[in-house]
Amino acid sequence: MAVFKTTLWRLISGTLGIICLSLMSTLGILLKNSFTKLSIEPAFTPGPNIELQKDSDCCSCQEKWVGYRCNCYFISSEQKTWNESRHLCASQKSSLLQLQNTDELDFMSSSQQFYWIGLSYSEEHTAWLWENGSALSQYLFPSFETFNTKNCIAYNPNGNALDESCEDKNRYICKQQLI
């Protein structure tokens, strides 16, 4: 009888040991995957006190796009000419960024990069126009009159704009308006 109890005890403790090892292994794998996902950083850092929208009622964006104030933004990490950037945005059913106001990109306020935006000079209208044909509001870029009309406009989320040859390569921002 004593031999039977010892054998049964060893069988139970061995089984519990194997179950414990399996649970520990599973926990280790889950923790490793969790830390790997956390270490992936986006191409920009959101500013303080700004909540990015993810799958909210008014904003559901594609993968690699950022939802903010019911718009979706694609912030490129690769550099392209202005026309290449424009075509890439159009292929994603969006357009190069058209700014509504200077705080539209608050979520990118820590970025120092310049990005192509959808602003170009129209010889026909003798005015700076956004891709949708609307005119530029002068309050967006107070020193705008110094820009060369043969160039394209690059914008920094800190509110700076500069004109560069359209053949230069910059990162770009695509925007999809959802509402």
UniProtKB/Swiss-Prot annotation:
Tissue: Expressed in NK cell subsets (at protein level). Expressed in memory/effector CD8-positive alpha-beta T cell subsets (at protein level). Expressed in melanoma-specific cytotoxic T cell clones (at protein level). Expressed in terminally differentiated cytotoxic gamma-delta T cells (at protein level). KLRD1-KLRC1 and KLRD1-KLRC2 are differentially expressed in NK and T cell populations, with only minor subsets expressing both receptor complexes (at protein level).
Effect of residue 158 to A: Has no impact on the affinity for HLA-E
Ranges facing Extracellular side: 32-179
CDD domains (alphabetical): CLECT_NK_receptors_like (cd03593)
Subcellular location as annotated: Cell membrane
Glycosylation sites recorded in the entry for this protein: 83, 132
One annotated GO biological process: negative regulation of T cell mediated cytotoxicity
Transmembrane segment boundaries: 11-31
Domain called C-type lectin: residue spans: 68-175
Recorded topology in the membrane: Single-pass type II membrane protein
GO cellular component: external side of plasma membrane; plasma membrane; receptor complex
First-listed, main subcellular location of the protein, grouped into a coarse class: membrane
Coiled-coil boundaries: none
Substitution effect: residue 162 to A: Abolishes binding to HLA-E
Glycoprotein among keywords: yes
GO molecular function: carbohydrate binding; HLA-E specific inhibitory MHC class Ib receptor activity; MHC class I protein complex binding; MHC class Ib protein binding, via antigen binding groove; protein antigen binding; transmembrane signaling receptor activity
Pfam families: Lectin_C (PF00059)
Reported impact of residue 168 to A: Reduces binding to HLA-E
Subunit details: Can form disulfide-bonded heterodimer with NKG2 family members KLRC1 and KLRC2. KLRD1-KLRC1 heterodimer interacts with peptide-bound HLA-E-B2M heterotrimeric complex. KLRD1 plays a prominent role in directly interacting with HLA-E. KLRD1-KLRC1 interacts with much higher affinity with peptide-bound HLA-E-B2M than KLRD1-KLRC2. Interacts with the adapter protein TYROBP/DAP12; this interaction is required for cell surface expression and cell activation.
Listed name of the protein: Natural killer cells antigen CD94
Gene expressing this chain: KLRD1
